[in-house]
Amino acid sequence: MYHKILVPLDGSKRAERILPHVEELARRYKAKVIFLQVVEYKTVPTTEGAFINLTEQEFDQAKKQAETHLEGIQGEFREKNIESKIYVTHGPVVGGIINMAAQEGVDLIALASHGRGGISRVFYGSVAAGLLHRVDRPLLMIRSRKTE
């Protein structure tokens, strides 16, 4: 049923709450797992237009940290004989996830929602909500709460 599973992560423990579910699916269907972290340029509006909040050096460091983090997760899955790949890309998160899903031809996107609501969702947006409205393939989402 599932041959490739895309797992977008953001470096947080809450996002990693999806991993046991992905592990179970990957074992059951002998699926390949693709771990993705999209490093987003943070912009700050100014009177002259928007500018990038991260310096090039800070951005490169963020990408390197993401790669190191994903390599650690990939190693854990390798020890369990689950085939996986990692990608670190940059740009808008939802678009990056959708593009990677198409590029890799995944059968499922699996992620943990941070469960933001209300004013927090207005200011920070919601990757989960963005995917729900734009994704063209099955989506497995679990809600990860602060207490978890």
Which ranges hold each PLM region?
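Gly/Ser-rich helix-loop-strand patches that form or flank binding pockets
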Residues: 24, 28, 99-148
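General small-molecule cofactor/ligand-binding pocket signal
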Residues: 36, 85-89, 140
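A cross-kingdom feature marking solvent-exposed beta-strand/loop segments within repeated
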Residues: 16-18, 80, 123, 145-146
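Structural beta-alpha unit
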Residues: 75-109, 146-148
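A short acidic, glycine-rich active-site loop
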Residues: 53-68
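Small/aliphatic-rich secondary-structure junction motif
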Residues: 1-53, 147
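Short beta->alpha linker loops
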Residues: 39, 88-92, 114, 126
